[in-house]
């Protein structure tokens, strides 16, 4: 069963900039501390990454996974689903962007199921840490480029 986490933050940058940074998957290793590799395998008709391969640090290990992105709710949000992963059975999520003048409210929802035998508390903590760290890193990247 997947554990879920949701969090939101306010970023001192316009929504268009936040969205552009969040969609530039191949640059994730430059600003997302846990992401070591992000490689776009397929693009949609608009040039956006539709299937992306990642290697990241998680749970004290190097994990590999492939996500498929859905842009049906753009420009307000985009979502993803796990296609393949070595330590995860599920990793489905969504970023939602709400413009508030020169600032943006960003919501991140994640459902993750780890394929390792871990106590429930650790699994829930892992989901929360992923969401929290991702939003902190995204905020820093967006505010640094404004």
Model region roles, listed by residue range:
Residues 29-33, 40-44, 55-105, 111-113, ...:
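Hydrophobic-ligand binding "helix-grip"
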Residues 35, 44-48, 78, 95, ...:
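Alpha-helix boundary/capping detector
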Residues 6, 106-107:
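Hydrophobic residues on conserved beta-strands that form the core of alpha/beta folds
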Residues 1-47, 133:
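Hydrophobic ligand-binding cavity/cleft-lining segments
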Residues 50-52:
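Short, well-structured hydrophobic secondary-structure segments
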Residues 111-146:
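A conserved amphipathic terminal alpha-helix motif
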